[in-house]
């Protein structure tokens, strides 16, 4: 391993796509042809190597990004298989953070689907170079050229077509390589392992020439010398074309587009060649952003084996044989088993025990790993997703990952009291694995409440609790994660006094509460916060050491708002005055005063209930359009847009989450199962007063 494990030989890639575009099948074929998998696993039979959790095999969707290492030519390819279902976009975002490049798989029939757009935008956020594989070219209605147009219209991407399909639908038999200007045809009987080159079929010559010219026009722009050569009529060599495609892919000047049918074993080897030829190695990425712990300075750290060790933990998984596994991407330096490193986010030391290279669900022990590698570490105590592991002497914190707030919650209780402790352990393990899943206890009812990104997300958590931890649970109806806020500025002056024998308590606070959107001089770093606290105490009216007590009190009490007990968000609290007593004042006294000030002051701020609004996208045949729009309107939805997509219509609407429970069944019956939808969290908005009254009455 170590001889060829040099940085320029590594490709860290993700394979991402819409659910059902054939992403897992494509990954399976890659593992098969790179010699890592001896039997091809079919998703629809529930046997794919990457989909190794039982729930994934049953549902035929990929939930956990399993990291797999394989070889092609003399390169090492680390593949992160990412989920394509909208409830799991957090997993995709997490994988994109540690990748150097990605292959976006598109369905040749459906083209660019809603989740593909979400994933593409996430990849844009992390500047991930990528190429496109138009899959399912053997299916009825597959249209490569329409897909390419959709890449432009839908994603605003610049596709660079480097292959054309030979034959369509059931007659699809190979591709035209526009770099070599040769046809590549697969033998059906050899499971796609055998293919041969031949001249381009006569009926495709003109189309191949047309697309070859388009390809050259785009790539020569990246190099003046080659441009001159091209314009003067000289032949541009295949090597020059490849070099420029690589340059343009890495700089995101364009996205190479390939085609094939993973299920029919056609087009996978040229896809692997393209991964190696065009996607970046860690050296091409060059740097990773982070902060030096000793100085607090933001810095760009070089990706290099000779630099001090720095790695990012991007995934935690429970393995039935090894226990907890932490997947890390090493950005610089190297580690060996037995070394001690530091988790710089938590300031805790971690000893490196077993290090494993993962192949979907098999593992290989390694003693050393270095920059560019993706490995799993067994037995880390304090490290969670998004933490940095670093060299003890030169400590750095790599860029943190941001995780969205959950929008749906439900109460769970174990079926027997004996399972209470087991359930607590199971949920805390699952929460460590998945930062978009939260667990809390409702103090009033004593119930355990779990929160997540959607119904499917929580269903799978409960399913895993049952299978992996053997905990049976009763589940409450899903609840919407409402919030509260204030709509006008209010001021409160409150004195907390308790002087009945023994040590007394005294604290006076004067606080101004204001809606965040009305704060004029809000700092940039505070704009995305739910709550901002500032002290404007001058002249020691409240001593410095007591001010954290005020902030702590407000932070705790805002979890139970004044309308219906939901967390209070989007407001700023400014401590402007106060008073203290030399003997009777304490941090605790100021904490109590702040809580009471909140309770008394907030009702004066005209508080309102907020609800999560989801962006819902429905794709439907024309004939059901009227019924579907009528139904969305009846759910308090606001239609944002209606666009034709092929022979279907796409309706985008903002709909309150509270109205979306069970929508999948309604949509199925409205469209005889032909329409599909996806939804993602958009924003919080005020609840209409008549709905707010119903919610308050239920609390």
Curated annotation (Swiss-Prot):
Q: Could you confirm whether the keyword Aminoacyl-tRNA synthetase appears in this record?
A: no
Sorted UniProt keywords: Cytoplasm, Elongation factor, GTP-binding, Nucleotide-binding, Protein biosynthesis
Q: Where in the cell is it found?
A: Cytoplasm
Q: Could you tell me which residue ranges the tr-type G domain spans?
A: 8-283
InterPro entries membership: EF-G-like_DII, EFG_II, EFG_III, EFG_III/V, EFG_IV, EFG_V, EFG_V-like, G_TR_CS
What processes does the entry annotate via GO biological process terms? ribosome disassembly
- Select a single GO molecular function from the record's annotations and give it: translation elongation factor activity
Residues that, per the record, bind GTP:
17-24, 81-85, 135-138
Query: Does the keyword field hold GTP-binding?
Result: yes
Q: Which Pfam families match?
A: EF-G_D2, EFG_C, EFG_III, EFG_IV, GTP_EFTU
Q: Would you tell me the Gene Ontology cellular component terms?
A: cytoplasm
| Principal location class | cytoplasm
Among PROSITE patterns, the record links this protein to: G_TR_1, G_TR_2
Query: What role is this protein assigned?
Result: Catalyzes the GTP-dependent ribosomal translocation step during translation elongation. During this step, the ribosome changes from the pre-translocational (PRE) to the post-translocational (POST) state as the newly formed A-site-bound peptidyl-tRNA and P-site-bound deacylated tRNA move to the P and E sites, respectively. Catalyzes the coordinated movement of the two tRNA molecules, the mRNA and conformational changes in the ribosome.
HAMAP family per the record? EF_G_EF_2_B
As for family, the record states: Belongs to the TRAFAC class translation factor GTPase superfamily. Classic translation factor GTPase family. EF-G/EF-2 subfamily.
Indicate what this protein is called per its UniProt record: Elongation factor G
